[in-house]
């Protein structure tokens, strides 16, 4: 079957003219040739490493640039988007006028016109009924490689029928000189137009802007159809039982969802519709800082030919120093999901989730290692999206720093957070799913809860043992905590027992409870949010 390809006339419809050549859906072998051409300069050039993977640099942008994110405010988005300039909550959805959008689009199309372009057609979403058909247009070979890794790769038959319903034009080489007069944050921009169904990128080379841009769009489109859109990992057991894991960076989401007894559905972005849980992506985007074969063998072995390393330090002999964070701590690798052996095949989807796990790394030492949540507590803790880090100082004094990120992914939410919470709980109630809050952080001993105990807790959740356990109610937070679980040290289940002086727990718990309440205040501007206050801690 012949693949349809794309004509210069189609690109002209987007405003891109006089293209010298279109490289359509290039193979991995062709991309390898293209990104290692000796004539390439600067951030376009890829370096072959001894792993077989290509390494690239993304310049000053080694992460997303949330302050440069904009959405066109028009008739479609006016009353639906969670705007940065409305309500109590702070977010990155800054409004953009149609006039400035047209100016930015002109900059990007001018940058791409007259060039040799890579066009990659992909799917975002493993479920054919709700997926986005996304067309990426770029002049940089490795950016085409990145989206081929990260999104779902259509078959030749699917490409023959491909009709894009979202266009991403990456003009990383262009910037906006008029940003000051236009009242924008900087010369760089990541802008979205939901009426035109288009994303524009200018000034930043970071690959993750394309990945997370489409996640933000799925986060807009799906919940409005009653489909949950989630920043989580997901896996499935031998009996078809599905678990989803929410958690911010450093809480153990990737580690705990990688389980030899269960198959991985995906590691980062999922939807939940009438058929079940499905991955948005066709690849993984893993952190590589301090990566070792012993600690994370799956990721380590996935770094081979066709993988793409970002911002790692490559030595003169082509070896990668994963311990060197001199460019950024956010070193990454993207690879197609089939580089991991233990995955759901051929399509990254499964049935309905019965276990929903919220991971938190509580550095305050207050929360229990595990608790069962009621429906209202599920919404409350989902909206809170709490974790905390220990910030060290010279004298070894460690003050915990709390982080609250709505729905465990505030940066990517396009609608008000309560809409995601409502859709998630509806999906859970329809199938009788249960949520659990799992603390992978610290307790009164000053030590982190052991990975052995945490894995035993996850096992008890997945095999149902936790639902048979007797529970007690932890005061202030009103959480149902099991009194004993197989394979878990019984001395840690009640966090108060880990303190030599229980009054210390009380003091810390009251402090943390106040922080929860202060954070949650921003949701009380909607009736749905105000109704959940009683599910939070009592001060």
Swiss-Prot record:
Subcellular location as annotated: Cytoplasm
Main location: cytoplasm
Cofactor(s), names only, from the UniProt record: Mn(2+)
UniProt GO molecular function: ATP binding; metal ion binding; phosphoenolpyruvate carboxykinase (ATP) activity
GO cellular component, one term: cytosol
Pfam families hit by this protein: PEPCK_ATP (PF01293)
Record: residues binding Mn(2+): 212, 231, 268
EC numbers: 4.1.1.49
GO annotation terms (biological process): gluconeogenesis
TM helices/strands, residue ranges: none
Reactions it catalyzes: oxaloacetate + ATP = phosphoenolpyruvate + ADP + CO2
Positions contributing to ATP binding: 212, 231, 247-255, 296, 332, 448-449, 454
Keywords: ATP-binding, Cytoplasm, Decarboxylase, Gluconeogenesis, Lyase, Manganese, Metal-binding, Nucleotide-binding
Pathway annotation from the record: Carbohydrate biosynthesis; gluconeogenesis
Coiled coil location: none
SUPFAM superfamilies the record matches: PEP carboxykinase N-terminal domain, PEP carboxykinase-like
Residue numbers binding substrate: 64, 206, 212, 332
Note on cofactor: Binds 1 Mn(2+) ion per subunit.
Cross-referenced NCBIfam families: pckA (TIGR00224), PRK09344.1-1 (NF006819), PRK09344.1-2 (NF006820), PRK09344.1-3 (NF006821)
Subunit (UniProt): Monomer.
Its biological purpose: Involved in the gluconeogenesis. Catalyzes the conversion of oxaloacetate (OAA) to phosphoenolpyruvate (PEP) through direct phosphoryl transfer between the nucleoside triphosphate and OAA.
Record-stated family: Belongs to the phosphoenolpyruvate carboxykinase (ATP) family.
Descriptive protein name: Phosphoenolpyruvate carboxykinase (ATP)
Classification lineage: Bacteria, Pseudomonadati, Pseudomonadota, Gammaproteobacteria, Enterobacterales
């Amino acid at each position: 079957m012949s693949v349809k390809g794309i004509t210069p006339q189609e690109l002209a419809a987007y405003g891109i003219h006089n293209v010298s050549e279109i490289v359509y859906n290039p193979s991995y072998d062709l991309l390898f040739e293209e990104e290692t051409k000796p004539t390439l300069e600067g951030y376009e050039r890829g370096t072959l490493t001894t792993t077989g993977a290509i390494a690239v640099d993304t310049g000053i942008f080694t992460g997303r640039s949330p302050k440069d994110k904009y959405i066109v405010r028009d008739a479609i988005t006016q009353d639906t988007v969670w705007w940065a300039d409305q309500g109590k909550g702070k977010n990155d959805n800054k409004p953009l006028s149609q006039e400035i959008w047209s100016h930015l689009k002109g900059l990007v199309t001018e940058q791409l016109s007259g060039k040799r372009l890579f066009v990659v057609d992909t799917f975002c979403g493993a479920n054919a009924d709700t997926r986005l058909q996304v067309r990426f247009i770029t002049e940089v070979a490795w950016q085409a490689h990145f989206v081929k890794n990260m999104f779902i790769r259509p078959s030749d038959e699917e490409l023959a029928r491909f009709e894009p319903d979202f266009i991403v034009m990456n003009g990383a080489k262009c910037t906006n000189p008029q940003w000051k007069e236009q009242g924008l944050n900087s010369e760089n921009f990541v802008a979205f137009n939901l009426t035109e169904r288009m994303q524009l990128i200018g000034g930043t080379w970071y690959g993750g802007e394309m990945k997370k841009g489409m996640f933000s769009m799925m986060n807009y489109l799906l919940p409005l159809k009653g489909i949950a859109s989630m920043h989580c990992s997901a896996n499935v057991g031998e009996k078809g039982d599905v678990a989803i894991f929410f958690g911010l960076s450093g809480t153990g989401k990737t580690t705990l969802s990688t389980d030899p007894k269960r198959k991985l559905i995906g590691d980062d972005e999922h939807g939940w519709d009438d058929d079940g849980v499905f991955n948005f992506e066709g690849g993984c985007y893993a952190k590589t800082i301090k990566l070792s074969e012993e600690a994370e063998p799956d990721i380590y072995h996935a770094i081979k030919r066709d993988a793409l390393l970002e911002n790692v330090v490559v030595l003169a002999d082509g070896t990668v120093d994963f311990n060197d964070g001199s460019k950024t701590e956010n070193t990454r690798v993207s690879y197609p999901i089939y580089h991991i052996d233990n995955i759901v095949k051929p399509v990254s989807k499964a049935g309905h989730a019965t276990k929903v796990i919220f991971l938190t790394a509580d550095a305050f030492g207050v929360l229990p290692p595990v608790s069962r949540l009621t429906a209202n507590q599920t919404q409350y803790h989902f909206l809170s999206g709490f974790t905390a880090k220990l910030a060290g100082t010279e004298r070894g004094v460690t003050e915990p720093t709390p982080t609250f990120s709505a729905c465990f992914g505030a940066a990517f939410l396009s609608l008000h957070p309560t809409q995601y919470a409502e859709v998630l709980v509806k999906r859970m109630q329809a199938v009788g799913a249960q949520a659990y809050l799992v603390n992978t952080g610290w307790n009164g001993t000053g030590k982190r809860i052991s990975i052995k105990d945490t894995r035993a807790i996850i096992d008890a959740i997945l095999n149902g043992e936790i639902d048979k356990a007797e529970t007690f109610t932890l005061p202030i937070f009103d959480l149902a905590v099991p009194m004993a679980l197989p394979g878990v040290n019984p001395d840690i289940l009640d966090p108060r027992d880990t303190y030599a002086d229980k009054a210390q727990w009380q003091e810390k718990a009251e402090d943390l409870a106040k922080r929860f309440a202060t954070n949650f205040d921003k949701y009380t501007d909607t009736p749905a949010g105000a109704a959940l206050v009683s599910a939070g801690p009592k001060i």
